[in-house]
Amino acid sequence: MDSSRFGCSWLRDLGFTEENWSLRKGSMEDLLAVSYVEKECFPPLEAATEDSFRERLKFYGNHFLLLYKGDQLISFVDGFCTKEENLTDLMYEDASLHDEEGSWQMIFGVNTVPAYQRRGIASKMLEEFIRMAKEEGREGLVLTCKKEKI
């Protein structure tokens, strides 16, 4: 997938001048990287499992936005689409509930490896994810977040 389509220019605005950044949608090839970043960002009892990400990538890999620096995953946003406008616990657990025709884009995770946190990456990733949802004609997005993660 052509990363220029996603507008990586914001990386320069954040002070990242290296040329080896890429922004793209997810695939099963990203499973280990996504699972690793999740474990870096959340305590063991809160982190989604590798099996959970396997199912998510299978059902809605095109709703993962991944930022790589070379071959290292730095940040990702993921979530599925649904006709429901409220995010429920079941949605986190059952990737098959994804409905590509759904008018609502849920956001299940916003993850950035600790070495790159507090540098504006997550905010820009969310902006790009929102832009993509609008481009796809979604009515809105839903994100829940623990206060200490904001």
Which positions does each model-derived feature cover?
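Acyl-donor-binding surface of acyltransferase catalytic domains
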Residues: 1-15, 84, 130
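Glycine-rich phosphate/pyrophosphate-binding loop shared by adenosine-nucleotide-utilizing enzymes
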Residues: 21, 72-76, 105
